[in-house]
Design a protein with these regions (language model features):
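Short, Lys/Arg-enriched, disordered terminal segments
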Residues: 1-2, 99, 338-341
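Acyl-donor binding region in acyl/amide transferases
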Residues: 43-44, 66-145, 259-320
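Short alpha-helix boundary/capping motifs
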Residues: 231, 317-319, 335-337
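Membrane-proximal basic amphipathic "stem/tether" segments
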Residues: 324-341
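A conserved beta-strand-loop-helix scaffold within acyl/acetyltransferase catalytic domains
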Residues: 2-73, 122-275
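Short capping/connector residues at structural and topological boundaries
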Residues: 169-173, 312, 326
Length: 341
């Protein structure tokens, strides 16, 4: 078996990438192309494992700088990681008829182990019961769980928002009914907007508000080109639900839609209107849209599970395995690995 590496999603045959992406719109080739354009200084690598001419495995990894700009120039803070910060889930696939999980990762390790990096991160095993296979133990990888995601799975019997609210606890059901009932008195309205570019001058500052206040998952702001890239690539499978008071837009949620899933990817909020429960209102409108379009799965993403569990969301851990390249550093500094993420 041998590896062939591609350095852009545009070079990789789409039939190969589909083995990883499946129906997930936020792992699609179009989405990966947008992500590549966001970080031109990072390295993107799509490694395909062949047995003669047969594709038996594929794995994606990126190399980025995790430390200060001074150290970046010296390449001291480079981290090799399967996946990106804009995506999650398994960024690999292998044919179990040809190779086991341990053997697949062993071959991948031989491919990457001499890279000039500070650390290696294998992400993501998205499950609450994650077993470390013998490869990770043999090579002294540390099991870390830096994040979790929240999912809502709608029942087939859920035909409208009232059905959904009835499944909540009495306390939370009454809370959301009160929020919805007060909308008329507060002159609140919602609209669905596909022309993101036209509204970007109003929406982007709202997104920056949320990004600056983030506590659980702090990351650099996504540039405005991300929004226009999504509109160009996804068409009507990407849109915003915008919340307004009178004629003023006070919040929005950006939704990316797949075959049976919607992903409220990010939000923007005017915090001067905090008392109008902007987050709750926008999230409940995401649920309403999913019900009306008969979509089963809502991926509410990272952060703030305490809010999301009121809606009946389930928490799923994002498991990673990581190690420093240097054996001595790895032995004594494993506890710092999560700080790189």
């Amino acid at each position: 078996m041998n590896w062939i590496e591609y350095h852009s999603i545009k070079e990789l045959p789409e039939t190969i990438w589909t083995k990883i992406a499946g129906d997930n719109p936020c792992l699609s080739a179009d989405f990966m192309e947008i992500v590549e354009n966001l970080h031109p200084k990072d390295s993107y690598n799509y490694a395909v494992l062949y047995d003669n001419k047969e594709v038996v495995g594929v794995i994606f990894y990126s190399i980025f700088n995790a430390l200060s700009s001074t150290l970046m120039k010296l390449s001291i803070g480079r981290v090799l990681m399967t996946g990106t910060f804009e995506t999650y889930g398994k960024h690999w696939w292998y044919n179990t008829s040809y190779i086991s999980e341990c053997d697949f990762f062993e071959m991948f390790w031989q491919l990457i182990r001499k890279q000039n990096v500070l650390a290696f991160v294998i992400r993501d095993f998205v499950c609450n019961e994650c077993q470390m296979n013998k490869f990770f133990g043999l090579h002294s990888f540390e099991h870390i769980i830096p994040y979790s995601v929240s999912w809502i799975k709608l029942n087939d019997s859920c035909m409208n928002l009232d059905d959904f609210l009835c499944e909540m606890s009495k306390k939370h059901r009454n809370m959301y009914k009160k929020i919805i009932k007060s909308r008329n008195d507060q002159n609140i309205s919602f609209r669905k907007e596909y022309d993101i570019r036209k509204n970007l001058h109003k929406l982007y500052p709202l997104y920056i508000n949320v990004n600056k206040r983030a506590k659980e998952f702090k990351s650099p702001p996504i540039p405005s080109s991300f929004f226009t890239g999504l509109e160009r690539k996804f068409g009507h499978n990407c849109f915003c639900i915008i919340m307004s008071v009178g004629n003023k837009d006070i919040g929005f949620v950006l939704i990316i839609q797949g075959t049976d899933i919607i992903i409220p990817f990010l939000m923007g909020i005017d915090y001067k209107y905090r008392e109008l429960h902007v987050w709750h209102n926008l999230t409940i409108e995401c649920v309403r849209y999913a019900i009306e379009t008969r979509i089963t799965n809502i991926d509410l993403g990272l952060t703030n599970f305490e809010l999301k569990k009121r809606l009946g969301a389930k928490k799923i851990n994002i498991n990673m395995f990581a190690r420093f390249k240097n054996n001595v550093v790895n032995r004594f500094c494993k506890s710092f690995l999560s700080k790189l993420l």
